[in-house]
């Protein structure tokens, strides 16, 4: 395919949108999935105030805006804002006319049917795309790791899923979801930093805490041992400079924050941690494929980027699994973008070309065509 008919691959995350062209090895555009609106009329006088700002522009003007994420827990909840994000993706980030390109979108596992239909409808009716497809995020991550069978623990900003996949097909009966991911960890870090005497409350300050989390947090192999070490020495302490120049010190919060992934009770949640959820997904799968799942446990998404997370998963799952079972955790270095990369790979395959939903098929069958063609 030449660039004129290049396929667009858009991975809409709850926190970040990743977009680019199929065949590339990384997304061209990565920006926050946020829409900001001025807090007060006329507040931004002389700046040719717009009624809304998207992505990085919204982030840079965050002090004057109220920021909203149109996706919650991986599901689109505000369609008007989502359209603004897609519009921004096409016209400002990729600088393409969507009516000239097939578009591959990604979706959360167990995405409600109505949600998939609405995505399909907007692509064909609002953006007039010639063809589109919706792929499950975890399956794309598995492709990126060069596998078609395995279990993906995909954790982004909005949710965490454990998805067993056999020969390219996600197994919905064994797919589990945890409404605990990056955003909850950011909120938790805000809370425990407040206990240290630092105040973070606004949506703008939430973005600062997210940055602290991404730069300084890590997963301890043994959190109790780490707590004892943090209490007796300053070896885990790090400093961070806030935008106003104030420097703050952060200690055991560095590992207490992501520890909530393994102990959701830290957040007052009754659910199992990511290790137990992964194990439960494997046990819900057919007994004949469990061995393949244990040896092909793939981490994916920004919330799996903490240093130490793979070792800890290895330790925890080994403790849960039958003792004879070999456990292998795969943590690809660029796993933050592995969903997007999987989309880029899939859309480039010659065998995939007959999978597209064409405009003609859409016109004949309506939005429900998505359930027949994308599964």
UniProtKB/Swiss-Prot annotation:
Tissues expressing the protein: Expressed in some hepatocellular carcinomas.
MF term (GO), any: ATP binding
UniProt PTM comment: Oxidation of Met-44 and Met-47 by MICALs (MICAL1, MICAL2 or MICAL3) to form methionine sulfoxide promotes actin filament depolymerization. MICAL1 and MICAL2 produce the (R)-S-oxide form. The (R)-S-oxide form is reverted by MSRB1 and MSRB2, which promote actin repolymerization. Monomethylation at Lys-84 (K84me1) regulates actin-myosin interaction and actomyosin-dependent processes. Demethylation by ALKBH4 is required for maintaining actomyosin dynamics supporting normal cleavage furrow ingression during cytokinesis and cell migration.
One Pfam family per UniProt: Actin
Modified residues (N6-methyllysine): 84
Family annotation (InterPro entries): Actin, Actin/actin-like_CS, Actin_CS, ATPase_NBD
GO annotation terms (biological process): axonogenesis; cell motility
Coiled-coil annotated spans: none
CDD domains: ASKHA_NBD_actin
Subcellular location: Cytoplasm, Cytoskeleton
Protein name, per record: Putative beta-actin-like protein 3
Organism: Homo sapiens (Human)
């Amino acid at each position: 395919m030449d660039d004129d008919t290049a396929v667009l691959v858009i991975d809409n995350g709850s926190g970040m949108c990743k977009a680019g062209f199929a065949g590339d090895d990384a997304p061209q555009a990565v920006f926050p999935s946020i829409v900001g609106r001025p807090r007060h009329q006329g507040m931004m006088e002389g700046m040719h105030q717009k009624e809304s700002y998207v992505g990085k522009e919204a982030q840079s003007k965050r002090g004057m805006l109220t920021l909203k994420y149109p996706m919650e827990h991986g599901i689109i909840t505000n369609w008007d804002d989502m359209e603004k994000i897609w519009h921004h993706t096409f016209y400002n980030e990729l600088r393409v006319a969507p009516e000239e390109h097939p578009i591959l979108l990604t979706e959360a596992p167990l995405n409600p049917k109505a949600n998939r239909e609405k995505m399909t409808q907007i692509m064909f009716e609002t953006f007039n795309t010639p063809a589109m497809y919706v792929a499950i995020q975890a399956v794309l991550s598995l492709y990126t790791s060069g596998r078609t069978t395995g279990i993906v623990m995909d954790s982004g900003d909005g949710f965490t899923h454990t998805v067993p996949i056999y020969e390219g097909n996600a197994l919905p009966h064994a797919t589990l979801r945890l409404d605990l991911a990056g955003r909850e960890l950011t909120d938790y870090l805000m809370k425990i930093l407040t206990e240290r005497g630092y105040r973070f409350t606004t949506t703008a300050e939430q973005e600062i805490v997210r940055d602290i989390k991404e730069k300084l947090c890590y997963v301890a192999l043994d959190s109790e041992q780490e707590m004892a070490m943090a209490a007796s020495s300053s070896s885990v302490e790090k400093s961070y400079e806030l935008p106003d120049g104030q420097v703050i010190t952060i200690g055991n919060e560095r590992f207490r924050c992501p520890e909530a992934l393994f102990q959701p009770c830290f957040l007052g949640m009754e659910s199992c941690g990511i290790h137990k959820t992964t194990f439960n997904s494997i046990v819900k799968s057919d007994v004949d494929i469990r061995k393949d799942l244990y040896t092909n446990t793939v981490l994916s998404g920004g919330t799996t980027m903490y240093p130490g997370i793979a070792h800890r998963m290895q330790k925890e799952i080994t403790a849960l699994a039958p003792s004879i079972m070999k456990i292998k955790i795969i943590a690809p270095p660029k796993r933050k973008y592995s969903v997007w990369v999987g989309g880029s790979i899939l859309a480039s395959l010659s065998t995939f070309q007959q999978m597209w939903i064409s405009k003609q098929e859409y016109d004949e069958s309506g939005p429900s065509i998505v359930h027949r063609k994308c599964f």
